[in-house]
Swiss-Prot record:
It holds the Pfam family Folate_carrier. GO terms for cellular component: membrane. Residues 124-136 have a biased composition (Basic and acidic residues). One of its GO terms (molecular function) is vitamin transmembrane transporter activity. Residues 118-137 are annotated as: Disordered. It comes from the Eukaryota. Belongs to the reduced folate carrier (RFC) transporter (TC 2.A.48) family. This is Putative solute carrier family 19 member 4. InterPro entries: Folate_carrier.
Amino acid sequence: MEDYALTFGINPFIALMIQPIVTMTVVDNQGLGLPVDIQHKAKPSPKASQMLPPDLGPPSFQNLLSPSEKLEPWDPGMRKLTVQTCGLTFIHPAGHGLCHPTAEASAETLSSTALNRPSVREGACNEKSTENKKPQDSVLWSHSRWFQGN
């Protein structure tokens, strides 16, 4: 209320005195003698997760605890990665390199067609392009070493 009073040039003390009178008049059922309009009852809109197909919806505890649907037979171009720390399983295309330090430090369980592929080693992303070589962050490097040790 004080902000409006300063905007319109009214002394804040006077505005504070007027505020309870205005509030009582507006809140009172017959204060201004105006008819009370019944507002339309708004229906709650569905959440975005309810509108998505089940396979695109957010993960739920039920999906995490129940055995997930298995993709059989494995596509030769896919790899199954299992992260030891949280027990999640990710399917990753074999054509894309694993360039994130935590991803390359995770334990890999490969499908039968991908058992003989070379594993991703540290710095493999930087070896591909020499022109955009950036120094590796020491914090990420230390975390990748920690993940490899566990």
